[in-house]
Amino acid sequence: MSRVCQVTGKGPVTGNNISHANNKTRRRFLPNLQHHRFWVESENRFVRLRVSAKGMRIIDKRGIDAVLVDIRRAGAKV
């Protein structure tokens, strides 16, 4: 399963670990993804999404119905 938020599309990015001696080694910065069940009143069921912390804030702000419309428009089966 890919490490991508279903709401924001955020995924891993790459960068460097930098030691005290300024040695650089490559690393990945992973998004803060959580599996979360959201109650969808219009469908009378739960929907399980893999969302980042920012994605949860977007759902709180816009509402789960509006976000699901965008996710389904993008082609994801939810």
UniProtKB/Swiss-Prot annotation:
Keyword match Ribonucleoprotein? yes
Q: Which UniProt keywords are listed?
A: Ribonucleoprotein, Ribosomal protein
Q: Which GO terms describe its biological process?
A: translation
GN (gene name): rpmB
Q: Name one GO molecular function term.
A: structural constituent of ribosome
- Is Ribosomal protein included in the keywords of this UniProt record? yes
Q: Name one GO cellular component term.
A: cytosolic large ribosomal subunit
Q: Report residue spans for region: Disordered.
A: 1-20
Family matches, as InterPro entries: Ribosomal_bL28, Ribosomal_bL28/bL31-like_sf, Ribosomal_bL28_bact-type, Ribosomal_bL28_sf
Protein family according to the UniProt entry = Belongs to the bacterial ribosomal protein bL28 family.
Q: Which NCBIfam families match?
A: L28
Q: What is this protein called?
A: Large ribosomal subunit protein bL28
